[in-house]
């Protein structure tokens, strides 16, 4: 694609990351990109004895995000648990990269960076009688555990972090939303969309609901339910998100 995004402002609703591939791709095409984290990440209490025992005897560990890698291994180290020969899985390439870069672990991961992709991995087909541990944040989808249980696995959640509202960015974000010109927000989860909706409601309801780039139909359904118009990417991979923006944005769309 050679499409230009000149004139478009993009607000990514998460913390700025060094070398963020999505921000870099959109900036290279001429977009003005800013990051506004609506949610902060907090570690949860240390693993209890029962969960530590389940992790220690597990036949596989599954990490569903970079945050799960960071906070999960902090808790594993505190509990004296280190990976030996246990197979380790990641939801996608970015999470696998975090495991490799932070811990030197080569994780198996699908090309389709989501629950459905994980469930297609050959290593997770015949799991009858196995114990698997999913490292994740509080809440979220239950589809992965349900799918593995249907195949006969015993599945435990290790919820190592939680998301909490990050209110200090709200004035700056509200000002950015009110500025004139083409605007697109990037929301990677339903949780972020709900936080955005609450922010707009606190702004007396007069602010229009912006268009939001989202990864997949599930998050798009949440966006519609909250009154946002979704631009739907095939997945959360930076290349797929970029493609969706380029399909959606043309300067002609915003000419009056």
Segments predicted by a language model, with ranges:
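Signature of uroporphyrinogen-III synthase
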Residues: 1-256
């Amino acid at each position: 694609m050679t499409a230009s995004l000149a004139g478009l402002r993009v607000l990514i609703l998460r913390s700025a990351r060094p070398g963020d591939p999505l921000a870099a791709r959109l900036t290279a095409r001429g977009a003005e990109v800013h990051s506004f984290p609506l949610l902060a990440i907090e570690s949860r209490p240390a693993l209890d004895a029962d969960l530590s025992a389940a992790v220690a005897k597990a036949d596989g560990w599954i990490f569903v995000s970079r945050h799960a890698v960071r906070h999960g291994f902090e808790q594993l180290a505190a509990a004296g648990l280190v990976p030996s020969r246990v197979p380790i899985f990641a939801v996608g390439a970015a999470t696998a990269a975090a495991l490799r870069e932070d811990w030197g672990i080569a994780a198996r991961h699908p090309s389709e960076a989501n629950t459905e992709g994980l469930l297609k991995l050959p290593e997770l087909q015949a799991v009858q009688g196995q114990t698997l541990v999913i490292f994740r944040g509080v809440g979220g989808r239950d589809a992965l555990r349900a799918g593995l249980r249907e195949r006969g696995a015993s599945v435990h959640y290790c919820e190592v972090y939680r998301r909490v509202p990050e209110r200090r960015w709200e004035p700056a974000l509200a000002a950015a939303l009110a500025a004139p010109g083409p605007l697109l927000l990037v929301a990677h989860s339903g949780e972020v969309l709900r936080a955005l909706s609450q922010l707009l409601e606190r702004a007396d309801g007069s602010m229009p609901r912006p268009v939001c780039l989202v990864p997949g139909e599930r998050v798009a359904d949440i966006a519609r339910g909250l009154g946002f118009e979704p631009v739907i990417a095939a997945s959360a991979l930076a290349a797929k998100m970029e493609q969706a923006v380029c399909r959606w944005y043309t300067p002609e769309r915003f000419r009056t």
